[in-house]
Amino acid sequence: MIHGTKELLESAQKGGYAVGAFNTINVETTRAIIDAALEERSPVIVQMTEKTFDYAGGRAIFQYVKNVAEFYAGDVPIAIHLDHGKSFEVVERSIEIGFPSVMYDGSRKSYADNVRTMKKVVALARTRGVSVQGELGSVPYLGEISMEDVDWNEYMTDPEQAEDFVRETGVDTLAVAIGTAHGFFRERSEPDYERLSAVAKRVSLPLVLHGASDWESDRVTEVITRGISCFNVDTAVRLAFIGGLRKILDSSDETDLRKILGAARKETREAVQKKMRMFGSSGKAG
């Protein structure tokens, strides 16, 4: 059985750990993520974005991930998720394809527009038994901001507004903004831990954190204790894959693509396993 994210994250919330939601783009990254879950006996979320749909074909990549996930679903809990759906139409298409979990990202819209579209997404999802993630506050991207000059107050989740948002929309999980940014940064701002705690006090459902791919274990542990039940991981997956490719291409004249891509897959699997241990999800597959 393939899961939505709601069930996995509610279990994580009760168990005091977090589940990793790892982005895939192809055969190799999909196998790396699921192989890591099997090795670690960890629940896992395999997710895709609109850009991956454009690259690999939405239905094609979903069916591949679904086939692999179903093959191993008896061993570990696996969820498949649409990450950062930017419009109702993309979310609707993903549900039609068969995604058991979707995210509508209206974080750059006005609060009213975010709520309006989010309610439409939830209404559609409820008719199909699909889990829904919303986002309030915004997580900027590498290149979009200067870490020295950014005014984080423009991006942060407001705890009181988060309570209203969850009540008005009926989302299953909520992505929050506490001073993180997508991508790897040389200089990191300090996360607003108190803001996270304030959100968690007002919102009882599982909270998701984006933009923390390069965090070390102390920060990870801190936000889990304050309410985070899921970490999105994209940049770390890509860098591990690229690192594996560079390593074999720089050290040999190998031309067998299976060996070259296999080396990248191995490097990626090991990086994902490290994240699972950090999140505390290893051994939680039951």
Q: Model-found features: residue ranges?
A:
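Generic N-terminal amphipathic, Lys/Arg-enriched alpha-helix
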Residues: T5-G20, E254-T255
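Hydrophobic "anchor" residues on beta-strands that sit immediately upstream
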Residues: V19, A79, S101, S131, ...
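Glycine-rich beta-to-alpha transition loops that act as phosphate-gripper elements at the mouths
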Residues: T24, I80-K86, L205-S217
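Active-site-adjacent C-terminal substructures of enzyme catalytic domains
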Residues: R188-E190, R195, L205, L257-R265
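Extended, intrinsically disordered, low-complexity segments
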Residues: R246-G286
